[in-house]
């Protein structure tokens, strides 16, 4: 299990209809297991300042899980506070090299995970926040 992260959650869940009309099938992103990708604000990957940190991807039976680490930048700190207070709880992926059968995604490559106000996949959400402080060990807030 990954130990050095600020929060974690489902980057995408399998077998759920996304708002773009696609459904991600099991193991569609299996080749991304163990890959680290940029963590971005709202899919705005055209500016370096919008990169908030990185996400380590883990392919699971239910989808792709992400362990996310925020940078010590102003945007990273702000995002950490928004997540900590529950103001933002959704994740989303940007993927390419998609192979589809109709609207079902059978393969692709995840290029970034985004912290978003509302995700396309209804199962993509932050489910654990780690509170780092000087007074105690890390504690999970779920």
Located regions from the model:
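Residue microenvironments linked to proteolytic maturation
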Residues: 4-9, 15-16, 38, 54-142
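Short, surface-exposed beta-strand-loop junctions and turns on beta-sheet-rich folds
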Residues: 24-25, 46, 72-74
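Polyanion/phosphate-binding surface patch
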Residues: 45, 52-55
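Amphipathic alpha-helical interaction segments
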Residues: 18, 49-51
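Intrinsic-disorder/low-complexity loop/linker signature
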Residues: 21-22, 34, 46, 62, ...
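N-terminal "first-domain core" detector
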Residues: 2-34
